[in-house]
Amino acid sequence: MKNVPKIWTVAELTREIGQTLNDNPDFVNCWVSGEISNYKNHRPSGHWYFTLKDEQSSMKGVMFRSRAERVRFTPQDGMKVLVRGSIRIYERDGTIQLYAEEMQPSGVGALYLAFEQLKERLGQEGLFAPERKKAIPRYPRRIGIVTSPTGAAIKDILKVMFRRNPQISWILAPAAVQGELAPKEVAQAIARLNRHSQVDVIIVGRGGGSLEELWAFNTEEVARAIAASGIPVISAVGHETDVTIADMVADLRAPTPSAAAELAVPVWRELKSDLEQLEARLHSTMSSQLQRKRQRLDSLKTIGPLSNPFWRIDQNRQRLDSLSERVEQGMTRFVSDKNGILKLLTAKLDLLSPLAILGRGYSLTYGPKGNVLRKSDDINVGQQVQVRLQQGILTCAVLAKSVDSD
């Protein structure tokens, strides 16, 4: 009897292949080299999806957000990389997929590549442009310092500051300067000094170290905090040969923390000398101005109104007399005009006055109730009426009445 071949379902076969891959240590935590293509940073999950290929084959890959956040550079299509991860089956599609744990550029360090990528991007935004850099104040009253409170940098900075000016005031905004928390703490310290506005210039830096130890000052978070600062920033990171992104964004770069203190704090003796020179210049300027004013006064005494102090008084008296005469003439004309208007109005009132009408021979007749009689029907025969003349009143009795035929 022949052996009956086993018939697999697609799901069973996929799971079996996946288990075989999982059981093979060569496919767990292995390194794969290839070229990135179809790279996509999925939003909002933050997972990376890509294809890893060479001249003969290709394989899909995924790096989840928790791992992708640790990669110092941004993958790009065409970039050759080394990827560490595990080979597994994506059961839904039945495809082999690389689940990446780590990624580094092939042939160049990951930190160097990240540095160059950020440098190019910020440069295109204009963050390194000379015209956006702020001037460092010549006579700062208080210095802000962003560094570790226990490192060598703070000691070097304070030593130089007090040597140059024992009276200088300073504020330390403590921050970690290496490690995963360093970028956030440095950026927050810069923002805090800006928020309180108690310093005139900020020194940001640390002592020397490896590229990894200095990396906080090559991050975008610190670079943007420096760029956003309304207070001038002096960067002082590492040794003279170390150049960071923070140095490029800062308003002034110092090769060391000690040099930053030299640039920020003027020497007390030089400051005193500058004040003495300013005092001398002020005295000279005031003396010159006073001398010119005296010469001008002397000139006015001989050729101007001051040569005769009563000259201006006489001029004003004549002007006052002229104005008084003009006011008097104006008032006379005003009164005359008003008298004429008054006479005209009086004449018009006389024409309308009832007394004036009576003066021309007319009279007013009032009935028993004091009402003015306008027609004969308003009174009866035998009733008394009062007749108002221009001068005097007559009391009369009505003997008869008639109506005009008109």
Swiss-Prot record:
Its EC number is 3.1.11.6. GO terms for cellular component: cytoplasm; exodeoxyribonuclease VII complex. It is found in: Cytoplasm. It comes from the Bacteria. It catalyses: Exonucleolytic cleavage in either 5'- to 3'- or 3'- to 5'-direction to yield nucleoside 5'-phosphates. GO terms for biological process: DNA catabolic process. Pfam families: Exonuc_VII_L, tRNA_anti_2. Keywords: Cytoplasm, Exonuclease, Hydrolase, Nuclease. InterPro entries: Exonuc_VII_L (IPR003753), Exonuc_VII_lsu_C (IPR020579), OB-fold_nuc-bd_dom (IPR025824). One of its GO terms (molecular function) is exodeoxyribonuclease VII activity. Heterooligomer composed of large and small subunits. Bidirectionally degrades single-stranded DNA into large acid-insoluble oligonucleotides, which are then degraded further into small acid-soluble oligonucleotides. NCBIfam families: xseA. Belongs to the XseA family. PANTHER family: EXODEOXYRIBONUCLEASE 7 LARGE SUBUNIT. This is Exodeoxyribonuclease 7 large subunit. The gene is xseA.
